[in-house]
Amino acid sequence: MTELIDGKALSQKMQAELGRKVERLKEQHGIIPGLAVILVGDNPASQVYVRNKERSALEAGFKSETLRLSESISQEELIDIIHQYNEDKSIHGILVQLPLPQHINDKKIILAIDPKKDVDGFHPMNTGHLWSGRPMMVPCTPAGIMEMFREYHVDLEGKHAVIIGRSNIVGKPMAQLLLDKNATVTLTHSRTRNLSEVTKEADILIVAIGQGHFVTKDFVKEGAVVIDVGMNRDENGKLIGDVVFEQVAEVASMITPVPGGVGPMTITMLLEQTYQAALRSVSL
C-alpha cells in the first residue's frame, strides 16, 4: 500500500519544536527571530504565499514584518529598502517575494540582500556554499524535501533520483543536496528526450515542472518515491500538483499530496533558516 508523505503534519511538528527553540532563544539571549517579507505589486498568488508565511511566523513566536509596495516602485528604491533591513539588527531574515515586476531585475535584488539574512538561499554566496558541500542558507523547497526524506526514512545512498525541472529554486539545489547524500542524480527538463523512459528508471522522482497533471503513472517505476512540487490551478480553480495523484499512487511506494505536501514544508524551512540566522547572530 502506498504511504502518504504528510508535509502538513511534519511541518506542524517542526513548527511546534521551532516555537520552543524560539522561546529558549528569547529567554537566554533576549533575541526574537525577525523575518522581513517584501511584496511588490498585487499578484494574487504571491499575496496568498505572503499571508501564509506571516501567519506561520507569528504562530511560532517570530517577529514578522511584511512590507507591501506599489508595483511602480523603482529598482533603486527597492534596493535602498533592502539595505535598511540589512542594517536592522532586529531582522535576521529577508525575503523578497518573487516574481517581481518586469522593470526590476530579480538578480540585482537578490544580490542586494546580505547573504547572512538571505533565508531563501538564492544569493550567489549561499549557492556557492551549497555547491562546495558546506550549505548555510539553502532554498527552502529542496531543504523541506530533505526533511521529508529524513522523517520518513527514505534511504538515498546509491539510489537513482530523477528531477523534472532545472530551476535555481528547486531543481539545481535539489540535485546538489541529493548528491551530498550519495544519490545518483539525473536532472531533466523541457528539452529532455524520451522523458518518461528516463523517469521510469527513478527510485526517487521529484517533479517540479509547473504543469498541472503532467506526470501520469506511465512515468513512474513500480515502488518509486514520488515528490510533487507543483502548485497549479485547474479550470475550476482547484489546486493541483504536477502529478496525477490518483494514478501515480497506484504504483508509487510513497507520494506527497497537493495540497498538504511540499508547500507547508517550504514555509517551515523558511522559518527554520530565520531561526538559525538569529542563533548565529548571538555569536557575532
From Swiss-Prot:
The keyword Hydrolase applies. InterPro entries: Aminoacid_DH-like_N_sf (IPR046346), NAD(P)-bd_dom_sf (IPR036291), THF_DH/CycHdrlase (IPR000672), THF_DH/CycHdrlase_cat_dom (IPR020630), THF_DH/CycHdrlase_CS (IPR020867), THF_DH/CycHdrlase_NAD-bd_dom (IPR020631). Transmembrane segments: none annotated. Keywords: Amino-acid biosynthesis, Histidine biosynthesis, Hydrolase, Methionine biosynthesis, Multifunctional enzyme, NADP, One-carbon metabolism, Oxidoreductase, Purine biosynthesis. Signal peptide: none annotated. The keyword NAD does not apply. NADP(+) binds at G165, R166, S167, S190. PROSITE patterns: THF_DHG_CYH_1 (PS00766), THF_DHG_CYH_2 (PS00767). It catalyses: (6R)-5,10-methylene-5,6,7,8-tetrahydrofolate + NADP(+) = (6R)-5,10-methenyltetrahydrofolate + NADPH; (6R)-5,10-methenyltetrahydrofolate + H2O = (6R)-10-formyltetrahydrofolate + H(+). Pathway: One-carbon metabolism; tetrahydrofolate interconversion. GO terms for biological process: L-histidine biosynthetic process; methionine biosynthetic process; purine nucleotide biosynthetic process; tetrahydrofolate interconversion. GO terms for molecular function: methenyltetrahydrofolate cyclohydrolase activity; methylenetetrahydrofolate dehydrogenase (NADP+) activity. One of its GO terms (cellular component) is cytosol. Its EC number is 1.5.1.5, 3.5.4.9. CDD domains: NAD_bind_m-THF_DH_Cyclohyd (cd01080). It holds the Pfam family THF_DHG_CYH_C. Homodimer. Belongs to the tetrahydrofolate dehydrogenase/cyclohydrolase family. Catalyzes the oxidation of 5,10-methylenetetrahydrofolate to 5,10-methenyltetrahydrofolate and then the hydrolysis of 5,10-methenyltetrahydrofolate to 10-formyltetrahydrofolate. This is Bifunctional protein FolD.
